[in-house]
């Protein structure tokens, strides 16, 4: 039996009341994109505070794709034990955007969803979410939505080639490679773009490392986090 008819949302759980300045529906995001005059919009999914590699990755994607803006779309639902609470992530991300991105190039919003850690399949689901919100590309990096070493490092990218039929989605993915802080260049780079570097020339950045530092009461160094962000964390 197939049933159809108008869809009515009864409520948005606690997300609308707990995060009134951040939670937005897909239609509200589409309306905001239209009001800003953006045509090409890159989405960045995050469950962590954004460290320097995340920041630079957004900048790289915008430049490479000649995008009008980027949607930083944070997850507001349940995470793993030890993850940073949503209100702290929200504050730190907005602070980073205010200090380090040009005006009217970034939209910070959140959505009501629990992290599933389903790796490649969740990456496809994330792409559908951002397509519904009006984005044209989604950044998919190493081990997107992964947990431990369960999935291959780039399975969340190759699933779009192997399992998603051509034309099934109206959104493309921006494939991010390994990123790291270059001691030589004093900035974050994609490691494949720095062939003259040795392993010692890089500082590897990760959300796990940041969480471990914070758990020990250590402020992340400037290679990891902007000082304004580290102060909030």
Which residue ranges define each predicted feature?
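Active-site cores that bind ATP or allylic diphosphates and position pyrophosphate for catalysis
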Residues: 1-49, 53-233
